[in-house]
């Protein structure tokens, strides 16, 4: 994956890469992520992986806002290619807007590689619990492009801050989401119940 990640980085030299992934459907909030790109400087590029019914609408939005050089719809990204995108990105963004997004496992995939996350505070959803605000990333108001952009910049604006979020993301994954940790937690529950 490292070789493929380096190739991806070469495609976007001197850019901060924001990666997002999911079905192109309304509850994923990709229209707000595209809008957020308007508030980011030209040294950012947003890569959105996935297919779905909103593909043409999102492409029209990108073109209408003149963001073709800043936002790329990747289409289907095969599972074997995902590690390269997670390795290559500087940050992962989960812009979902409805509690249909119950957890957002893609956040955990990003954190396992030490990538900070920008996610949304969806009421009655586990998304903002998975991404600890101020530790592994930032959680923002759903449907708010400006807050998405501000959080992306806040995390990546200087190396010291960025490294702290990278370390926090990896630590959050280690403390809560490794397979061993989850098995230990389940066994602990069984022991209490029995």
Q: What residues fall within each predicted segment?
A:
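Nucleotide-activated donor-binding/catalytic signature segment of Leloir-type glycosyltransferases, i.e.
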Residues: 57-77
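Acidic donor-binding loop of glycosyltransferase active sites
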Residues: 87-102, 115
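A short, well-ordered alpha-helix in the C-terminal region of glycosyltransferases
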Residues: 70, 147, 154, 161-176, ...
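Short alpha-helical donor nucleotide-sugar binding micro-motif in glycosyltransferases
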Residues: 76-77, 84-89
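Short hydrophobic beta-strand element within catalytic cores of glycosyltransferases
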Residues: 112, 116-121
């Amino acid at each position: 994956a490292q070789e493929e990640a380096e190739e991806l980085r070469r495609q976007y030299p001197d850019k901060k890469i924001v990666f997002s992934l999911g079905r192109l459907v309304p509850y994923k909030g990709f229209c707000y992520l595209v809008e957020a790109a308007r508030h980011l400087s030209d040294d950012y590029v947003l890569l959105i992986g996935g297919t779905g019914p909103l593909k043409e609408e999102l492409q029209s939005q990108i073109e209408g806002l003149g963001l073709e050089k800043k936002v790329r719809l990747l289409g289907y990204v095969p599972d074997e290619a995902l590690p390269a995108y997670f390795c290559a990105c500087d940050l992962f963004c989960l812009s979902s807007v409805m509690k249909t997004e119950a957890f957002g496992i893609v956040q955990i995939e990003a954190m396992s590689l030490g990538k900070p996350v920008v996610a949304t505070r969806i009421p009655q959803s586990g998304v903002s619990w998975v991404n600890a605000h101020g530790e592994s990333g930032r959680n923002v108001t759903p449907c708010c492009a400006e807050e998405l952009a501000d959080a992306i910049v806040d995390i990546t604006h200087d190396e010291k801050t960025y490294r702290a979020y990278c370390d926090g993301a990896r630590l959050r994954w280690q403390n809560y989401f490794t397979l061993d940790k989850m098995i230990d937690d389940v066994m602990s529950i069984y022991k209490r119940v029995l």
